[in-house]
Amino acid sequence: MTGMKNKQEYEEELEMGKGGFTLPGESGYEELTLKMAEKWGADVIRDSDGTVLSDEITHAGYGIYSTICIIRDHNAWAKENQDKLQQTFLCTPPQAAESDTLTIGLMDSFFAEQFRINDSAESLEYWEVYDRTTNVKIDNADWSYDKEKGSVSLSGIIPFHKYTVSFLAYRIWEEISMYNHTTNHWDKEHLMQIDPRYPETQEYLLGWMKHWCETHPDTTVVRFTSMFYNFVWIWGSSERNRNLFSDWGSYDFTVSVPALQEFEKQYGYRMTAEDFINKGQLHVTHMPGNAKKADWMAFINDFVISFGRKLIDMVHSYGKKAYVFYDDSWVGVEPYNGRFQEFGFDGLIKCVFSGYEARLCAGVDVPTHELRLHPYLFPVGLGGAPTFMEGGNPTLDAKKYWNSVRRALLRAKIDRIGLGGYLHLVEGFPDFCDYIEKVADEFRLIRSFHDAGEPYRIKTRVAVLHYWGSLRSWTLSGHFHETYMHDLIHINEALSGLPVDVKFISFEDVKNGILKDVDVVINAGRAGSAWSGGDAWKDEELVTALTKWVHEGGCFIGVNEPSAVEGYDTYFRMAHVLGIDEDTGARVCHGRWIFETADPEHLIPEGAGVEAKENRYL
């Protein structure tokens, strides 16, 4: 039921109009739950954050998904062990000094319900004060911390220079619960998140997991949401700027004193606050990383696998399957780094708005691939727009998202789809219920096509070239509405439904000979970004390999500022291949070739266009 099925089973389900669908059930709405399970052809019923399933539902003959967030819902233990909450480095905004002294309030700019200063002796060893005018670290003797006021006072500094304080803070409200709480106007206790980096936390969680398995005999699949560390989401104190920083792929929320200490022992050098804060910019996934970031990511991945495997093995020992949600606390799981199979997961679930996210799920080596469709059954959607409430149109939302996702499903097989949220909200939207019935039937039909054979592909083999390579296959850092400003996400979305083989390669891959298996290379992004490549283009071996490959028949496609880096005869290092370069000001007095622009028929679809760029020349 929850694993892979043979063709006959799929055909039988297709004929009966059921299977491959996960329905969010809700205690108190048993009749509705079973009615919609029949209408949508569900074979599995799940709970959601804030809902439970009654015995009537769990004993109705369906598979049961139970959702657990392993690091939250432990408030009783967390209150007794507040030194074992998860942490992060925060950095105050730059503040200009008017004299040789300055006092900076640490929490003035941050959401007090999300963070609390960690001012333990071990934590203070990692705090740093910087002169941001010179970007020089201030000696510890020149600043002091006032515990009662939550502030740092500087002395002997330079007037009218800017200063920041980087400090460790406990995260006292789990971010996804915080979002759901504020979005749905819940009135209940804030959930804290505990850090399994501590041996005491590990012992507690293993005991909790054992008890949970024993007290949930009807559960067939345990859905981990997800592992231990959430993507970064820092809220501000002002409602006018609540979302200070969010990055789906960043590792800032994995920091703790014991993690920093263990890293130093294992890698032989000490990570500092500035290694994370990075002049206040943090290490955005959209920018190239460095060796220290790579080491930290590998270090966290080692830990998440080692302790995560213990929990998964326990779930398996009770005869249950273990699926993981590829969102929320996914950091450190890294399904595309070549080690994902070490977890032992039976399935992967990805929430999707777009085709590229369906391909992101389908490309992971795991027995079962499942998509969680939007819109979620919430009163409001992401961004606060009304959904299942007055003024909302969830049917239109569902059509928009399904149209984006469906084309990708024709290219790569997905085993299951489903919804999440509060089922009772659909009662006022019968057209939505009818449309999801159609979606479920379409999905089962598409799935049956894959059982008949591989989809048709043309011979062209496409490679998307950027800093992260295969580690960030298909995605950049989050959903489309979070990354739409980047050219590459539009390209990924287009590729997700095209009949071509697609791979994602790094600059090192090029130097190691991967181009022999590629017909087209796409490099797309703003200069200096991870997607264009930044300083990677200073490598003559890279430029030579690509030039030779094009000479032998390869096709190099550049978008926006491909191969851009300063310091050479051309701004685009591949200008000799592209036939075009960008003038950054150095060629303002030079002559230019005259050319005419034309729109070739059938090259650009009706209604679409290509944005013109200034300062480009032949």
Language-model-detected regions and their locations in the chain:
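Glycan-processing catalytic domains of CAZymes
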Residues: 2-532, 536-540, 550, 558-560, ...
